[in-house]
Amino acid sequence: MANITAALVKELREKTGAGMMDCKGALNETNGDLEAAVDWLRKKGLAKAAKKAGRVAAEGLVAVESAGHHAAIVEVNSETDFVARNDGFQAFAREAAKLALNTDGTLEGLQAATFPGSSETVQEKLSNLIATIGENMTLRRVAKLEVSKGVIASYVHGQISEGLGKIGVLVALESEGDVEVLSTLGRQIAMHIAATSPVALDASGVDPAVVERESNILREKNAGKPDHVMAKIVESGLKSYYKEVTLLEQPFVHDGSKTITQVLKEAAGKAGAEVAIKGFIRYALGEGIEKEEGPDFAAEVASMSR
């Protein structure tokens, strides 16, 4: 049997909002498997759907850079927030985002690019920065968005300097409409994406494995129902799920009475042309990276007194 620690129970409670005893029971039933325990609780109706963002603990910066009809976003990690506020680190992150505009959009392509004002590659520049500052750093990921007509809007949450912060969003609006209207709308939608963290533009973009997982949970929660009833339950449940996690179906954070789809239709009238979201990118600092926590302070003091 797995060792069910208090920390594991706490993490499951934070993910699901379920009670302590329910979480302990779920972990015992699933032999300490955290994700399986989340599903177990949901099947029992004891937890809401959990977003798989993972524990966020890495430090560093997300940087965005726009230039006309294309934009780039990068994430550079450091071990401490102190280093993330270092001028040299910030300059590196900003230049990396600018360079990404003219690369192929891959991490390898950016790492191999020549850093401005030197003969070094981006990766070599980072290695020298590590040696200078004395802390490990990583150029973790990069992405680009392009649009032939329209605008690419950006938003940085937790901004500590222009284009640098904890969450970065790019959203491409494709339209022949008024650029000022599109720019304002784009920024509002970028802020919406930062707040709601959609996993896809619409239902067709959701990972089939995730859809199957949600379907199985709905079936197990409603076990014993006739087949024709079960089919309707699963269909209805998936519709609710899509409204929660797909951008076009989400209620607009600036006006909850409208979905993003409805907002785009209304914007077409103001812009003088149809408006469509071609794509979006959302980077949250440290997303999916798990950092080992230090020992419990009370336990550490107790051990020292033995």
From Swiss-Prot:
Q: Which PROSITE patterns match?
A: EF_TS_2
Q: Name one GO molecular function term.
A: translation elongation factor activity
Q: Name one Pfam family in it.
A: EF_TS
Positions of region (Involved in Mg(2+) ion dislocation from EF-Tu): 80-83
Instruction: Please give the InterPro entries that the UniProt record associates with this protein.
Output: EF-Ts_dimer_sf, Transl_elong_EFTs/EF1B, Transl_elong_EFTs/EF1B_dimer, Transl_elong_Ts_CS, UBA-like_sf
Instruction: Name the keywords, alphabetized.
Output: Cytoplasm, Elongation factor, Protein biosynthesis
Taken from the UniProt entry, a GO cellular component term is: cytoplasm
The UniProt record lists the keyword Protein biosynthesis: yes
Q: Does the keyword Coiled coil apply?
A: no
Intracellular or extracellular location(s): Cytoplasm
Q: Which PANTHER family is this protein grouped with?
A: ELONGATION FACTOR TS, ELONGATION FACTOR TS, MITOCHONDRIAL
Q: Which family does it belong to?
A: Belongs to the EF-Ts family.
NCBIfam families per the record? tsf
Q: Main role? A: Associates with the EF-Tu.GDP complex and induces the exchange of GDP to GTP. It remains bound to the aminoacyl-tRNA.EF-Tu.GTP complex up to the GTP hydrolysis stage on the ribosome.
* Entry protein name: Elongation factor Ts
Which gene underlies this protein?
tsf
